């Protein structure tokens, strides 16, 4: 026999979007005693509708929380049906996953409370040992107590120690002062770490003092047409390929500053190649009449005056130690950076200075230069075969500039 089915149309009278009722979902259901009270709480700062249900009576507690995973995928409503109008009112009703907990089974143990007694367990143990222990045990307890440090008695001593340390360390340099001392001890010209252009990293006045720069007069070199006669006006005659090649490109009055740098470079090369000379008079004999103020400035910055030497400055003795040798070389490289527009080939320069390329690379890195294999564009500019470009080292300067840290190395072969 078939079952007859009827279909009724029900009108949705209203829908309440804001939660106005909540449904507690208890496993297998339950029947709450009449003395049970329930409270519903909502999290104020939560963007979602999150609720907490709490109820209790004399023996039981009821706890419920909004199921966030279920809430994200499902939406629950409670419908209030009006049979006369055949309409229904829908109320949003979050479901709270709930459970019943017996008060007798809850762990109501509170935090551990420290004993008010100041007696240490070891003190109690020692008291028993002194009362009932052997002579050997009593002696060990007495030695232990005699050597025990009482922190309370050390409070005043600790204050005195701190005051003594402060007094002793007040004259020690600060971190900034130590950085300044380290910077001054570097073998490089004074660097401008805030430079926004590569020319500002080692400005010319940090390489050649302004007072000395004005004594480098190169107008006669600029006016001279014959190249050999031009080279004869430089302070050191060593047939430098670099000086001769660079001189060909400095022919305009606007290049006067670079010509002054080239002149000073020639003088530094002369001092470096005669670094075993230990007397100013002998040094001047090997140079081509440079202004004496330039020589005095170089000797004051790049040499160590021998102790016990008195008399005229022209006759004084000095020596150039390994640190000052590196300092002269760093100044030479800084000048060459300016002359070569801050892109320098390592190999020809190493031949010019009679140094190993690795030594030149390490000095450039002390200056903060970046040393890498030549790029395709650089290889084309310098006429380097593409097959060897990656191993052909080029030194460049870039901004922002970071001053490299100085590291101490063990003594070893210099070159």
From Swiss-Prot:
Keywords: DNA-binding, DNA-directed RNA polymerase, Nucleotidyltransferase, Nucleus, Phosphoprotein, Ribosome biogenesis, Transcription, Transferase. The keyword Phosphoprotein applies. Residues 322-415 are annotated as: Interaction with DNA. Changing residue 365 to A: Loss of DNA binding. InterPro entries: RNA_pol-assoc_fac_A49-like. Transmembrane segments: none annotated. The keyword Transcription applies. GO terms for cellular component: nucleolus; nucleus; RNA polymerase I complex. The modification Phosphoserine is found at residues 34, 151. Pfam families: RNA_pol_I_A49. GO terms for molecular function: DNA binding; DNA-directed RNA polymerase activity. One of its GO terms (biological process) is ribosome biogenesis. It is found in: Nucleus, Nucleolus. Component of the RNA polymerase I (Pol I) complex consisting of 14 subunits: RPA135, RPA190, RPC40, RPA14, RPB5, RPO26, RPA43, RPB8, RPA12, RPB10, RPC19, RPC10, RPA49 and RPA34. The complex is composed of a horseshoe-shaped core containing ten subunits (RPA135, RPA190, RPB5, RPO26, RPB8, RPB10, RPC10, RPA12, RPC19 and RPC40) where RPA135 and RPA190 form the DNA-binding cleft. Outside of the core, RPA14 and RPA43 form the stalk that mediates interactions with transcription initiation factors and newly synthesized RNA. Belongs to the eukaryotic RPA49/POLR1E RNA polymerase subunit family. This is DNA-directed RNA polymerase I subunit RPA49.
